[in-house]
């Protein structure tokens, strides 16, 4: 059975860790939709459209990866796309506990949606969008942690916040 796979997240911004997970997933699964969540409850630095555009730019060389923004419940988006597999990254035991709770809820809301968890490559185990944003907002360099187009977008956003 062909699996349509979702990799959901806020991606504010997308990091090298996210990109590593996308590339590894693209090598394992037929098609990946990177599902960029609107996340209205989060105070995002980039708009949904900006985040979708950045993810599209950094994944354009991956032919079996597409990028879409969505709002509302992730399971509703998965159902709309007829996805039956969800990829999530796990860095820490805190991530595991959070994801375990989400997976339990997803099973109740959409039993046919399976979850696959990937651990990060060692060099990205500490990396998060929150840390990247904080460092950038305080004037630190994040070029080692994000693709260059994202680094430039962060520099621009921090210098002229909207």
Curated annotation (Swiss-Prot):
Q: Which GO terms describe its biological process?
A: coenzyme A biosynthetic process
Q: Which keywords accompany this UniProt record?
A: ATP-binding, Coenzyme A biosynthesis, Cytoplasm, Magnesium, Nucleotide-binding, Nucleotidyltransferase, Transferase
Q: Which organism is it from?
A: Aliivibrio salmonicida (strain LFI1238) (Vibrio salmonicida (strain LFI1238))
Annotated InterPro entries: Cyt_trans-like, PPAT, Rossmann-like_a/b/a_fold
What residues bind substrate, as annotated? 10, 42, 74, 88
Q: In which pathway does it act?
A: Cofactor biosynthesis; coenzyme A biosynthesis; CoA from (R)-pantothenate: step 4/5
Q: Under what name is this protein listed?
A: Phosphopantetheine adenylyltransferase
Family membership, please give it.
Belongs to the bacterial CoaD family.
**What's its top-level EC category?**
transferase
For this protein, the record's PANTHER family field holds:
PHOSPHOPANTETHEINE ADENYLYLTRANSFERASE
């Amino acid at each position: 059975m062909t699996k349509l796979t979702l990799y959901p997240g806020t991606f504010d911004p997308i990091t090298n860790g996210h990109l590593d997970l996308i590339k590894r997933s693209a090598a394992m699964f037929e098609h990946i939709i990177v599902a960029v969540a609107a996340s209205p409850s989060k105070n995002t630095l980039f708009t949904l459209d900006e985040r979708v555009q950045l993810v599209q730019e950094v994944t354009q060389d991956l032919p079996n990866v597409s990028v879409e923004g969505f709002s509302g419940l992730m399971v509703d988006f998965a159902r709309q796309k007829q996805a039956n597999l969800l990829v999530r990254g796990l860095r820490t035991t805190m991530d595991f506990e959070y994801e375990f709770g989400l997976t339990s809820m997803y099973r109740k809301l959409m039993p046919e949606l399976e979850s696959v968890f990937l651990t990060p490559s060692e060099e990205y185990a500490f990396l998060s969008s929150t840390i990247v944003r904080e460092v950038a907002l305080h004037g630190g360099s994040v070029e080692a942690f994000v693709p260059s187009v994202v680094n430039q977008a962060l520099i621009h956003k921090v210098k002229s916040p909207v």
